[in-house]
Each structure stands twice: as structure tokens, then as C-alpha cells.
């Protein structure tokens, strides 16, 4: 059976709303319009306006309302039309949601999911194309999820909704319409468990979200040069499954990390630092990081393409760590 990513997300929310009447959805256009990307399609009709709530265009306002509801024992799912707009709500996310469990000595929980599209789409320009994966991963108290397949979106969303503290669920606008095979019964997927999508012994490629497709496509091309790539989908960035990465590096001796976001202070840099510390003796080459260029993402289609990681970039990075010209 195949379903799209948007259907997988909708199904996860629907099932959890049936299972637990404390779960509700709120955000801009999630009810009457059924979501800017139709992820909440059918939920208003099924659960009514008290549990599927349209909000004004005020991320700071409704994020704060949702955090307060979570403190009171409800389980809000907050949809941001894009995580670029979540910048308006950073105080509530970083200072209220992420900190209160610690600052209350464990007395106050904040079971909330912040979800929506993150990163580049297609010609939506610099203010609507930013990738916040590294930004949120930097904050203690937040879990950060960035799946690729439909099944992982569903299983990880179920886990996120059931979590007793805040989860940042980073989706991708382009992936919403992609179809994937999915199991008949999808179980919750634990956080911090990466997935090896392709086994190999030449080089380890680590990535997440839509860049998984880029990694798999590049790996298939490199196969013709007898370079067997092991491709790892992180699925969750925080907690990070460093054990799976290190076990792979012990086998391959080489590591390439792909991320759509910028290089400086990025996820690739963090993974490289950990691997250099924990598995230095197993490395046969310096770690390579393929990332977005250090510019605001352009609107022009030719410049946008140049600013984002490409198959060419990945293939070159893999050949570099394999010392192949």
C-alpha cells in the first residue's frame, strides 16, 4: 500500500485524536481550509471546531496559548504554515516550552508538538526557504524530528504527540505529495534511532529529510564506479543516533554528511566533531560536509539550484573521501 506524506501525517493526528481526547490541532487555516498543504484534511468535520482550531495570523499569540494549554494537561499540535513564521513564536518555544520542565524541577510538563514545513520548497525566496534544523537542535529541552518516508512521518508523529515534552517536527513542502510504501499497521517509532536505507562498505553518507532522496540518487550513480555507499537516514536529529553512524564509519572508514542548511554551526559540523572525537582512528579521510551555500536562498530558479546541495556536490564529496579524481 502507498500513501503520501501529507496523508501519513493526517492519519497519525487522526488516530491520536481518537485515542486521546486531550489532543487538539491549532494553527492558521487548519480547520475550514483544511491546512495550507491539506495536511489536516477532514479533521474539522470529524472532530469539530473545539479540537481543530483556526487561529489569527499571530504566531506569537497562538503558540503562547498552546504552551499554556500543554502546561494545563492538554496535548496541542501547533501547525506553523512554515517554520519561517515560527520565528515570531521563538520566545514561547525556547523560553517557555523548552525550559519549564527543567525550571520546575520536573513538576510541569509541556506535551506539545510544533509542526510544519521547514527549508527550501520551490522558488519561495529567502524569507520562506530557511532551514531551522540546526537552530532548534541547539536548544536544550527540545526534541527535533525530520523524517523522509511516509511511514517514518506517521510513526514519529505518533511518538511526538505522546511525548510529555516539546517536539519540533520538521516537514518538507516538496515531500508532502510524495508517495511511499507503508505498512498496514504503523507502530510508534522511538526517537534517536537512525535507519540504514542502503548498505555499503566504501563510504557512509548521513542525512535527513528530503536530502535522503539526494543521497540515494547519488549512491546509485556512484555504484557504477564500484563505490558502495552506506546511506543512513537520521530520522531524528535530537536525540541523535551517533552509535549507528560510528558503527558504519568503523566499516567504511569514510563519512559524508549532507544537510540543506548552512555549513557554519550546522548539523554536519556537529556530527563531524563527534565522529572525529569518538572514531578518529577508524577514519581514512577527513569528514566531508555537503551543505547549502552561505547565502540567503535566491528566488531565481537557476540561482536557487546553485545554492542548494546537488547530486554533483555529493558525488564529488564521496569521490574526495575515497581519493578518486
Curated annotation (Swiss-Prot):
SMART domains: Transket_pyr. Keywords: Oxidoreductase, Pyruvate, Thiamine pyrophosphate. Coiled coil: none annotated. It holds the Pfam family Transketolase_C. GO terms for biological process: pyruvate decarboxylation to acetyl-CoA. The keyword Membrane does not apply. It catalyses: N(6)-[(R)-lipoyl]-L-lysyl-[protein] + pyruvate + H(+) = N(6)-[(R)-S(8)-acetyldihydrolipoyl]-L-lysyl-[protein] + CO2. Thiamine diphosphate binds at residue 59. Its EC number is 1.2.4.1. Its cofactor is thiamine diphosphate. GO terms for molecular function: pyruvate dehydrogenase (acetyl-transferring) activity. InterPro entries: PDHB_mito-type (IPR027110), THDP-binding (IPR029061), Transketo_C/PFOR_II (IPR009014), Transketolase-like_Pyr-bd (IPR005475), Transketolase_C (IPR033248). Gene3D superfamilies: 3.40.50.920, 3.40.50.970. It comes from the Bacteria. Heterodimer of an alpha and a beta chain. The pyruvate dehydrogenase complex catalyzes the overall conversion of pyruvate to acetyl-CoA and CO(2). It contains multiple copies of three enzymatic components: pyruvate dehydrogenase (E1), dihydrolipoamide acetyltransferase (E2) and lipoamide dehydrogenase (E3). This is Pyruvate dehydrogenase E1 component subunit beta. It comes from Rickettsia bellii (strain RML369-C).
